[in-house]
């Protein structure tokens, strides 16, 4: 929880509240995080600077998120735009990747005559209605396509779960 919060610009006060810890401990967590991962801080600053210069940031697929308030004189308004400058490339790229995976999965199902259906996408998760006799093949296709949707320096890792409802599948 702290990892995402820090990347998305959580304050010392916000982290202390979220983790139910004293503020000085939250400050130590945030400071320690950036000491351990200085590249994250560099990324955050570079993203804000690019946004200030261009007025937008991009995903790894080239989609743009325009940030008209990035140079606002109002610190609150500007801060919101700065957080979006940091978050949009990450979350937008994740959205791009899952859409690529969905297209590949759909095409594989069609090509292989799979009758099971993709029924829902929620953030980085896909839900399917799977015929029992297709369970292993569907799982194999989905994991392959989720993990191969986009090549990066770090591997994309996917997992799967099955159940008669969403809760069971987790």
Feature-to-residue mapping (PLM):
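Conserved catalytic core of nucleotide polymerization and phosphodiester-bond processing enzymes
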Residues: 1-170
């Amino acid at each position: 929880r702290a990892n995402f919060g820090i990347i998305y610009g959580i304050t010392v006060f916000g982290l202390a509240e979220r983790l139910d810890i004293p503020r000085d401990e939250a400050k130590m967590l945030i400071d320690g995080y950036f000491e351990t991962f200085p590249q994250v801080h560099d990324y955050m600053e570079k993203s804000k600077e690019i946004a200030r210069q261009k007025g937008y940031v991009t995903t790894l697929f080239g989609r743009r998120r325009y940030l008209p308030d990035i140079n606002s004189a109002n610190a609150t308004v500007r801060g919101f735009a700065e957080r979006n400058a940091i978050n949009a490339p990450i979350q937008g790229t994740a959205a791009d990747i899952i859409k690529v995976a969905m297209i590949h999965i759909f095409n594989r199902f069609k090509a292989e005559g799979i009758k099971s259906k993709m029924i829902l996408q929620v953030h980085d998760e896909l839900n399917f209605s799977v015929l029992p006799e297709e369970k292993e093949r569907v799982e194999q296709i989905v994991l392959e396509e989720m993990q191969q949707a986009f090549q990066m320096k770090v591997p994309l890792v996917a997992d799967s779960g099955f159940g008669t409802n969403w809760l069971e599948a987790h």
